[in-house]
Amino acid sequence: MNFKDLRDFLDYLEQRGELKRITHPIDPHYEMTEISDRTLRAKGPALLFENPLGYDFPVLTNLFGTPERVAMGMGRQQVQELRDVGQWLAYLKEPEPPRGLKELIEKLPVFKQVLNMPVKRLRRAPCQEIVWQGDAVDLDKIPVMSCWPDDVAPLLTWGLTITRGPHKKRQNLGIYRQQKIARNKVIMRWLAHRGGALDLRDWMEKHPGEPFPVSVAFGADPATILGAVTPVPDTLSEYAFAGLLRGSRTEVVKSISNDLEVPASAEIVLEGYIDPNEFADEGPYGDHTGYYNEVERHHVFTVTHVTMRNKPIYHSTYTGRPPDEPAVLGVALNEVFVPILQKQFPEIADFYLPPEGCSYRMAIVTLKKQYPGHAKRVMLGVWSFLRQFMYTKFVIVCDEQVNARDWPQVIAAMVNHMSPLRDTLFIEHTPIDSLDFASPVVGLGSKIGLDATAKWPAELAVSNSDQSDKTTELSLEALKACLSDEADVLDVALPEAANDKLVLLLINKQEAGQAQQLLQRVVDKLNGDSPLKFVILCDDDVNIHDWNDVIWAMTTRMDPARDSLRIVGQDLICFDATNKLPDEVEREWGTPIRKDPKLVAKIDSLWDELGIV
């Protein structure tokens, strides 16, 4: 499938019932988010809001709201075919000459596609049919969405930010959210390790104080959009990779006000510069973690020109608690990651980033184990091989027969094959996502690896505790009786897959230190006689009978080293996955995203009329 532009892709989706046009007037402020969120959770179509209240441009959301549409955008019929894309990337990351005629023939399709990597430069392009400049630049005319009740301002989300460092020939494409603060200014929120920020840093070193050119394209063709979120090798441009995906060269045109090349078919392009000395407070915004992030200082992007197609479509999205569109992209791109990892670690059978773990904070790896300690090598490899995994806090390694996408199987492997103290690896003071408010300081926190593989004799010889003689069964009734005098415990779960070795507790937390004190009392009451290996403590807003809820709480509310209580005498680990109170942490704790009940009721009344799903 070869889509020349976004409109071509939308036609394709509409023919297959994967696009819904909404003619009813809908407000970009909050209403579009509520409708898009419901549609995505129902695995519904992409949405084209043709009459946004107060604006002339239609708004496209939920474009990549299912893994299947991501695959279509990459020119594939099935999600499983995305592993072919991963094999391409693995080869391009570490190319090897063919080792014979047979391998040459096998790799001919890849070699042929390389012809599509160079860009095709146009002198005129659809994205420059209309031009705003000077006083005509007015971002207030674009239907930029406001997503959540406590968001500070409207937020541009799907723009492909195009930069070039002074020492690089190739451009960088990245997707960074942008807070609108004026008719011609937005705040560019990019993390220090991202390509755009690195280009700016190099520019500031070579051209101190000079404006840094930037262009931002909205509504490019699907291959170019997805190329910007795929882990392409540093030596490969996103435009070149888009050409590989599409099967035809990426068409670009030079920006009107700078030398940066933008997608020729983009719907809207913002051009301008970043003044290295101009900053502003960004946020708070409801983010993909399900919380509002902290306010941070970031550079301001001044827009000097806006170019667009005739009757442009504004491409947008929202981010919130999984599942959201970034989480769906994560599920699809997971298939791309597997061959890349297998190129370096052939012993990896499967690799999964659960969306409930914010798509990157937890990884499940299944392994063809070959020697003692193999699982720990793989943990360290995951953390160090690709920068996409530098923020992964939890890595669980299981044997190859375990289905990494099935929580009962993963939990069974943990309780049956782990000695919690021996088979957990803690690493402190490591890079952590700045949005992770559970880390002790911004950008720095701990990681945990859990070796849930069957142990070899050499591994069994290094044991912290022998639980083989703990034959006492632990029933749910007995556990509840044991905790009957604990008024703070609201619910108890003993999952069937856990084989009496893992318990989840729901508590009403009101005071600092309450969770840790409760965990210690639970340990004392069990008195070393129970078969328990793991205790997980959650707040009363978590459904402890739903692994999706539990994993979300663990990955958003824990710093593994700080919030793990290790009981040496009983070979037991307790995880405190509760919200931390001000006296427990120094950082500002995240506030969960809450929907406005009045807005929900309004969309309820419209829902049947919209006829989306």
UniProtKB/Swiss-Prot annotation:
Cofactor: a divalent metal cation
Membrane topology: Peripheral membrane protein
Region feature (Unknown insert): 460-584
InterPro entries for this protein: UbiD, UbiD-like_C, UbiD-like_N, UbiD_Rift_dom
Principal place of residence: membrane
Domain of life: Bacteria
Pathway participation: Cofactor biosynthesis; ubiquinone biosynthesis
Location of this chain's protein in the cell: Cell membrane
Enzyme category, top tier: lyase
Protein EC: 4.1.1.-
GO cellular component terms attached to this protein's record: cytoplasm; cytosol; plasma membrane
Record-level Gene Ontology MF annotations: 3-octaprenyl-4-hydroxybenzoate carboxy-lyase activity
Biological process terms in GO annotation: ubiquinone biosynthetic process
SUPFAM superfamilies per UniProt: FMN-binding split barrel, UbiD C-terminal domain-like
Free-text function comment from the UniProt entry: Catalyzes the decarboxylation of 3-octaprenyl-4-hydroxy benzoate to 2-octaprenylphenol.
UniProt record similarity statement: Belongs to the UbiD family.
Subunit (UniProt): Homohexamer.
Protein name listed in UniProt: 3-octaprenyl-4-hydroxybenzoate carboxy-lyase
